[in-house]
Amino acid sequence: MEQPQYNSYKVRKLDDPEEKKLAILKATQSIEKKFGSNTILNEEGKASQHVQALPSGILSLDCAIGIGGYPKGRLIELFGAESSGKTTVALQAVAETQKNGGYVAYIDAENSLDIEYAENLGVKSDSLIFAQPDTGEEAFYMINEFVRTGAFDLIVVDSVAALTPASEIDGVKMPGQQAKMMSEQLSQLVGKVNQTKTVIIFINQIRSTMSGLFLNKETTPGGSALKFYSSVRIEVKSGEKIKDGIDTIGKKTTLHTVKNKVSSPYKKPTVINIFGDGFSQEIDVVTTALQLGVVKKLGEWYSFNGQKLGRGIFGVKEYLSHHPSVFNALDNLTREALQFS
């Protein structure tokens, strides 16, 4: 990469407030012209230039990211322990993108995607471009071909751990093979997706390794390249189980934005994952609306525009699932309050 060159220059201290503002504006504009918009963050922790967003299908996550969804033209990493809900988070984005008329490719390197489950979440399997590569190199070839078209809004890669280099499959095992492949591929890919505004979600796992004096350390496969090139990294954590009597019907899931280059990081929204149905949009929207004052709560009863929605959060979910017009009105008003389109 060509390194920026600096010409010799003179400096002086500015005292006039207006001169300072103008000088700062010129400096930030110069930097963004050379290195791209969104390089500079404003006082609210948001990129100084508008970043287009691809809705995640989870409103509270859109809020946590800060711009209304995943930033377009960027790499995203979803990582967490086994069965934490990573694939479900990704599939919610697939369904939302398709609902909005977008095109999606799903790279199933693990050969484990349950199509029926994906359809339950709203994924249209008949219009989903689905691929199952044998090697990491094959996967990246497919990704690059999809990006090259400029037609895809979202590409999901499931998962990084399954992107095994061809040489390793052939029996030639050397330390750092996968990390080297990831570094080489991602360094070339990051600029291309910025041009096509494609979002690529990489699903990754947390693994425990022994380090130091037998200390247990958690890490993610694939080396450090994905951590570096991702604009947003989200850790998916399982939480409290949701029960209906003695039956466990779901669980609470925390989505922790451990890295965020388009807004402030370290947000931790908690969402409800209903087994078989995914994250409840009704509960998610109502919870967000309650925080904004769009929905009112008196005791156990929730209300919207003077109309009772139900008793308890699951009562509200039941009501809204049978009254889509009320849900759509609530969803739209909540997004307006958040200044999301």
From Swiss-Prot:
GO terms for molecular function: ATP binding; ATP hydrolysis activity; ATP-dependent DNA damage sensor activity; damaged DNA binding; single-stranded DNA binding. Coiled coil: none annotated. PROSITE patterns: RECA_1, RECA_2, RECA_3. GO terms for cellular component: cytosol. ATP binds at residues 80-87. Keywords: ATP-binding, Cytoplasm, DNA damage, DNA recombination, DNA repair, DNA-binding, Nucleotide-binding, Plasmid, SOS response. Signal peptide: none annotated. It comes from the Bacteria. Gene3D superfamilies: P-loop containing nucleotide triphosphate hydrolases. SUPFAM superfamilies: P-loop containing nucleoside triphosphate hydrolases, RecA protein, C-terminal domain. It is found in: Cytoplasm. InterPro entries: AAA+_ATPase, DNA_recomb/repair_RecA, DNA_recomb/repair_RecA_CS, P-loop_NTPase, RecA-like_C, RecA-like_N, RecA_ATP-bd, RecA_C_sf. One of its GO terms (biological process) is DNA recombination. Belongs to the RecA family. HAMAP family: RecA (MF_00268). Can catalyze the hydrolysis of ATP in the presence of single-stranded DNA, the ATP-dependent uptake of single-stranded DNA by duplex DNA, and the ATP-dependent hybridization of homologous single-stranded DNAs. It interacts with LexA causing its activation and leading to its autocatalytic cleavage. This is Protein RecA, plasmid. The gene is recAL.
